[in-house]
Amino acid sequence: RQMLPNIKFRKAEIIDINLKKKNVVLAQGFRKRLHNIDYDHLVIALGQESNQSIIPGLEHHSFTMRTLEDAYNVRNHLIGCFELADVTLDKKLKKRLLNIVVVGGGFSGVETIGELKEMSGRLLSYYKNISENELKFHIVEFSDKLLPELSDEISEYTLSVFKKRKINIHLKTALKEVSIYKVFLSNGRSIETNTIISTIGSTVSKIIKQSGLPLKNGKIITNEFLQVLHLENVWAIGDSALIPNKLDINDYPYSPPTAQFAVRQAKLLAKNIILKNMKKNLREFRYKSKGSLASLGSKKGVGKIYFFNVKGLLAWII
């Protein structure tokens, strides 16, 4: 409200989007009473939801890493593991408490394990009965390299940094099943752990799925003006939308689900709504990525800026 003083903000749960009546149904307050809000223009930016049901047990025995709340949950859980590991006399329990498994070797997985490794190093000074050698970190990736979205050079650098930091890397390995204190891998191995963090699996929001909006590959289909197909006054941006991007014929034909693209989409969408109300021609979404960056923790990072690979301290600073 402080950042957007001229905007009416409502903290509520979206129950339904009624495209025929042009309204949104909300549940608000302690009693979750239903309210209808009519719209002239509807902007959908709900993102995607985690889909942990793709692997048996993952949904019930793992943390996700998609929101700030997820990050706080993982942080508090890890501190709790340190607290118990510092005082327990059960060696098997202590080993399990200090085993951390991250599933997924893309941007989210690499950044998660890098930051957790750094955080754990800082925590050690407060827990005298835990040594650095007792901490074990594992990252599991189905592909044959970390950060498969980037070049082999960047992937190899990331691999070498993680190996130096004694992070166990399981490439060309799938997660088969998860139980309450164990993960089972496709290579026949299993890892006992109290901490499983999943950075894989996305699916369309339930609200979007039930609304009748046109979908492709779990995303809302839009035109180049960010309008939902066949619905001129309904707009969609961000991870929940499949938005054409025709800037370069060699580019992937749709916008990738990154914050960099979402910010540009939001700015254009605001202009297009104004243009539509003024009955003027709308502007197409055209944007070329400036690159991608990932933090590896300990003042190291990797990424690609335009055509240049960057790594180490420079990438971390950027």
Briefly describe each language-model feature range.
Residues 7-99, 197:
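FAD-binding core/adjacent interface of flavoenzyme oxidoreductases
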Residues 12-17, 117-224, 228-230:
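A Rossmann-like FAD-binding core segment of flavoenzymes
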Residues 27, 45-46, 171-173, 199-200, ...:
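Short, well-ordered coil/turn residues at beta-beta hairpins
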Residues 47-50, 113, 202-204:
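Short glycine-rich anion-binding loops that position phosphate/pyrophosphate groups of nucleotides
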Residues 60-91, 182, 190-264, 271:
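FAD-site-proximal beta/loop scaffold in flavoenzymes
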Residues 76-132:
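Rossmann-like NAD(P)H-binding beta-loop-alpha module
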Residues 261, 265-318:
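C-terminal, flexible cofactor-proximal segment of oxidoreductases
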